Amino acid sequence: MKISKVVIRRMSLDFKVPFRTSFGLNTRKDFSIVELHDSDGNVGCGACSAFWRPWYNEETTEGALFVIKEFLVPSLFDAGDFKDPEWFFDHTSWIRRNRMARASVDCALWELYSKELGIPEYKALGGVRNEIEAGVSLGIEDTPDKLLKTIEKYMNQGYRRVKCKIKPGYDIQYMRAVRKEFGDIMLMVDANSAYTLNDIDLFKEMDELGLLMIEQPLASDDIVDHRHLQAAIKTPICLDESIDSVDDARRAIELGSCRIINIKVARVGGLIEARRIQKLAGEKGVYSWCGGMVDDGVARGHNMAVATLPYYRYPNDIPGSDRYYADDIVTPSTYIDSHAKIQLPDLPGTGFELNRAVVEKHTIEKWEFTK
């Protein structure tokens, strides 16, 4: 692999409907797109999913752009002709954390690599299926009745797994209402670190609900308190923000801190580390699913590819193109079928290309680099 040109775009898309989590209300998604060109005319695209403010982790749109432009782009050119994306990922391991910045380049390299091989990205990664199941992730509503109406809308579209964001005061009474209304649907909750061990009795009560999992109930950097909580409740804990690397996953599993892992490609630094995590965890009986970052079309394509790996066993936060945004920055758009399944394109790369007119419409700044 040899990179001849890099194009970086800072972009912004407004949500169709504001999305509320325990962190607050979000009305737009700021992100960046990285295009890598080789001398044969192939192009690979990756997305940097860091938000404009550091509410999910320490990275921001501006900070990640700095790392990409000042460190990752020069490293791409300095590397010359290298073997594959995994070589470059390990070659740039000297860059501490900044995983969302690194993920944007890693994903772009994987698409470029698979195009050079002439095969779909999911096959290049080692995927074992050509379709995935999507779930829907719902923000916090003002009342249980509003949540029930929202769930009904998405179930009518074919979704079978529903994830509801929760925070203190907007939790068990909401989920009881959901269970009463919809019976045995696949139901899970995501706390985004809104609770502490002082809330252990609440989580014991949640055992009665038969939840698929409780995602990241405690602190975002914790695996010790989660160990104590998991030992006290029947419902599986799924770790999200606590797992940034394969070593984090190993430690959490050895402690018994979780039974499931949400692997977000952006959070762990790209497709390489996601593949490593699912393999290590899966071989120990801890299965995974692909989480999302209210993703654009570029990020969604890579998420679809990684979700075909063998130890991804739960429905994924990979909705159709029309879930979050009015405009899709890639073509073709993605839609779920009546069974909440999404078919992956049998084309080199992710199978999606930038919709140039839409991309230009939503581009705030653009940079080009050549060696």
Tell me what each language-model feature is.
Residues 221-238, 243-341:
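Shared catalytic-loop signature of beta/alpha-barrel
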Residues 123-233:
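Metal-dependent enolase-superfamily TIM-barrel catalytic cores that perform enediolate-based chemistry
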Residues 1-5, 114-115, 119-131, 342:
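N-terminal amphipathic alpha-helix/helix-capping segment at the start of soluble metabolic enzymes
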Residues 1-44, 49-55, 323-327:
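Structured beta-strand/loop patches that form or line metal/cofactor-binding pockets in enzymes
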Residues 323-371:
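C-terminal extensions of enzymes
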Residues 3, 34, 41, 72, ...:
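Conserved, mostly hydrophobic/aromatic
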Residues 5, 37-116:
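Metal- or metallocofactor-binding catalytic centers and their adjacent structured scaffolds
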Residues 48, 136-138, 164-166, 189-193, ...:
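A cross-domain feature marking catalytic cores of carbohydrate-active enzymes
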